[in-house]
Swiss-Prot record:
Species name: Clostridium botulinum (strain Alaska E43 / Type E3)
Name of the protein: Holliday junction branch migration complex subunit RuvB
GO biological process entries: DNA recombination; DNA repair
Function according to Swiss-Prot or TrEMBL: The RuvA-RuvB-RuvC complex processes Holliday junction (HJ) DNA during genetic recombination and DNA repair, while the RuvA-RuvB complex plays an important role in the rescue of blocked DNA replication forks via replication fork reversal (RFR). RuvA specifically binds to HJ cruciform DNA, conferring on it an open structure. The RuvB hexamer acts as an ATP-dependent pump, pulling dsDNA into and through the RuvAB complex. RuvB forms 2 homohexamers on either side of HJ DNA bound by 1 or 2 RuvA tetramers; 4 subunits per hexamer contact DNA at a time.
One CC-aspect GO term: cytoplasm
Subunit details: Homohexamer. Forms an RuvA(8)-RuvB(12)-Holliday junction (HJ) complex. HJ DNA is sandwiched between 2 RuvA tetramers; dsDNA enters through RuvA and exits via RuvB. An RuvB hexamer assembles on each DNA strand where it exits the tetramer. Each RuvB hexamer is contacted by two RuvA subunits (via domain III) on 2 adjacent RuvB subunits; this complex drives branch migration. In the full resolvosome a probable DNA-RuvA(4)-RuvB(12)-RuvC(2) complex forms which resolves the HJ.
Record-level Gene Ontology MF annotations: ATP binding; ATP hydrolysis activity; four-way junction DNA binding; four-way junction helicase activity
Annotated spans, Head domain (RuvB-H): 255-344
Binding site for ATP: L20, R21, G62, K65, T66, T67, E128, D129, Y130, R171, Y181, R218
Amino acid sequence: MERIVTPAEMFEDGNSELSLRPQKINEYIGQDKVKERLNIFIKAAKNRKEALDHVLLYGPPGLGKTTLANIIAKEMTGDLKITSGPAIERAGDLAAILTTLKDYDVLFIDEIHRLNRSVEEILYPAMEDYALDIVIGKGAAAKSIRLDLPKFTLIGATTRIGMLTSPLRDRFGVLCAMEYYDENQLKEIVIRSAAVFGCKITEEGALEIASRSRGTPRIANRLLKRVRDYSEVKSNTVISLKEAREALELLEVDNQGFDKVDNKILEAIIDNFNGGPVGIETLSYFIGEELGTVEDVYEPYLLQKGFIVRTPRGRIASDKAYKHLGRVNNKNNNSNKGQTSFFK
């Protein structure tokens, strides 16, 4: 069973996310620095009648990378083609996609860090020269021909920028770090989404949902849908603070936005490893989750909120974690010193 607070896309998110996505960059809430830069680059490219330079969006999942790609395509008056690194298994698969593009189209590759090397190398001339090198024949009779491609924009999205090879990363002209949203930004998103859903919500109710949404719009919208269900069944016409709080408690999402898995991680570090340090592989094994899942999904938010600290020797529970679980920290382990951002 998937967690309701997972930032990864769930099956139920698909259709609702499409209806909730803003269509213009000035409608997009949050990520102000990213928006400002992209707005300038888009206007400059349109004034010169050129394709926008290739864009790399990196950061935790659920923060709006696909939405931004859709907005960029609309602003550039092109079509958006969406695929992912794991879906492109062979160089021929990518070549087939590239040859269907038109001028100013946007090719969005999610999880671009998972492209295999042979596929990645096809991208190099496509990104630099808008060209596709194809080898015809085999052995001594083989020859290479170059096909011209339209002036397109590649947008890559990744949660693991460190896993990108330098040659690929260096070919992106625009790099944008996506950051977690603050509660006021998420409150705006919840109020906007409620209007799209056709339900009424008070500012206090929206803020309560926002405060438990882990800084992630996807989670905020998902929680809003479940709170709406609760409110409708209880015959309430407006989602108030009371209804929002009751529904979220029923969903077992606490006031930090943590669920059982998050608290299990904190409990493991404190109760089973004496507050740490503990290696991420050991911790992953202990809680029964894959290493990549812990690094990509669970750890970033705990780091961002300052509940765990990443040190050269492993993960340490901070004083906030002890207080959250009602434990007393008797260790002098400098638990508030170390790396508290996953993307530094």
